[in-house]
């Protein structure tokens, strides 16, 4: 019996729930901005006028004063041309964007982000 391949939304939901449950200190700092799906022309124009931008990564994670983007894809999924363009804009502005294909890959990147912030030297002014 073969298992059905996991969809992008299933991978994303598993990753988000893992972070939410494993690292409660990140709650409110990891979120999804709905910017995809099918809409009628009027709703699409309203969303675009209010700031919805195609190609934004699926998950935005804020930590230690930095932003990170996570784009979820299946094993055979590809980044669209508009996603590639937005990812390059973010990266050229110092915002890393990771394309992840599993919850485990997401966990790895989050672990790296959290541990690098934890190992950062304290540069705050004490006693000034």
Where do the PLM segments sit?
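Catalytic phosphate/metal-binding cores of nucleic-acid and nucleotide-processing enzymes, i.e., regions
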Residues: 1-128
